């Protein structure tokens, strides 16, 4: 806060009238604006995913925001943040593949399975490169994985990490996860090894480090972690926080637009077919009404599609039995991605 130039001032009075607080809250909500699109933040180490969403929401002064998959505070890299109507497409990103580059430190197991935890076991043994390479096929494909004790999984309504912090012994059941690719990238010294993993939804890289250490006859934990891919979003889509803040400053002075940082809402829908409709059919779908597919030129696709009209996203829909049934309708009034952002590097 800046200094006060007034030499004398009445004591600040706090208005505890709930109606006044409600009016103030309503004013804040009125001041927020409609912003629709994706921002792929290159999250810095030390920031939680929830904090990152709050920062983006403030920078864009957006009404709604949410992220597509938690990234641990100790990790850096891609955190896709949905603004406005893009929040309706979050599940499509969360179901996509993830790619991580991570460093395992050998010789210690920790209660969190990462460098922030308490050491629970130690070993003097260090795995050889040959032993590590021989192990990798065992962690490729569909495997059974026990999530870390410190995870967001619920046990009888309680988060596992809350129970663990309270000193309770948390027993988590193994669950199937899919690891599409696991490679050894580097071995800087005997104490560390750098890996890259491409995996499906629900995979814990921390558990991967723990289990590899145990099978190699030693212990291991994550000491560095970076996410480089989330669904359709790769490193070329990421924007560091300082660059985003600088863009916001330029936009505030009229030298740029925040739209330049947005990716279109439909970027999250890369893996499903698009279906173009006429303006008349678009009006029906927008009202929540089904549209019949008719004529020789009617599309033959079925299942989930995203519907466009005049090149603009309209709805998520299901196609079947000769009709289009709208499931989620998009209202893209407000700030959206710049036209050129549809073409990505």
From Swiss-Prot:
Active site, UniProt feature: 72
tRNA processing keyword on record: yes
InterPro entries: PsdUridine_synth_cat_dom_sf, PsdUridine_synth_N, tRNA_psdUridine_synth_TruB, TruB_C
Keyword Disulfide bond: no
Listed GO MF terms: pseudouridine synthase activity; RNA binding; tRNA pseudouridine(55) synthase activity
Family to which this protein belongs: Belongs to the pseudouridine synthase TruB family. Type 1 subfamily.
Described purpose of this protein according to its UniProt entry: Responsible for synthesis of pseudouridine from uracil-55 in the psi GC loop of transfer RNAs.
Record protein name field: tRNA pseudouridine synthase B
